[in-house]
């Protein structure tokens, strides 16, 4: 396995520990809330939650912000734009857009694990316009065409 080093900066509001893998085979690292005061996410509402970190990803890498399954299943708290994308040239604070799909208000406390961050390599492409596309068995079937 290749290990890529990524620079990370602790901002003034940083609290707790840097994102880290929970197990040897974890794909994502937990992000920690760095809000000074508790933030209430009302039912059906969205809040932007600070993490207190900024990163410098290498070219051809992105960070994906995804929900934590425990928050989603127990409280209906998920990432509104999942997966959120942090581009390699972004140097500002990583913030997480959380939405409360539950029926009750939910309070985000400083130090709470709020989301997962996955670092992924990607390729850029160039479009090649074409009059036709190669046929496949699936064709243009979509939105449930391969079964439920």
Swiss-Prot record:
Q: Tell me its EC number(s), please.
A: 3.6.1.23
Q: Give the GO molecular function terms.
A: dUTP diphosphatase activity; magnesium ion binding
Q: Which UniProt keywords apply?
A: Hydrolase, Magnesium, Metal-binding, Nucleotide metabolism
Q: Which cofactor does it need?
A: Mg(2+)
In terms of CDD domains, this protein maps to: trimeric_dUTPase
The annotated pathway is: Pyrimidine metabolism; dUMP biosynthesis; dUMP from dCTP (dUTP route): step 2/2
Q: What protein family is recorded?
A: Belongs to the dUTPase family.
Function summary: This enzyme is involved in nucleotide metabolism: it produces dUMP, the immediate precursor of thymidine nucleotides and it decreases the intracellular concentration of dUTP so that uracil cannot be incorporated into DNA.
- Give the protein's recorded name: Deoxyuridine 5'-triphosphate nucleotidohydrolase
Q: To which species is this protein native?
A: Rickettsia rickettsii (strain Sheila Smith)
Query: Taxonomically, what lineage is the organism?
Result: Bacteria, Pseudomonadati, Pseudomonadota, Alphaproteobacteria, Rickettsiales
Task: Give the gene symbol.
Answer: dut
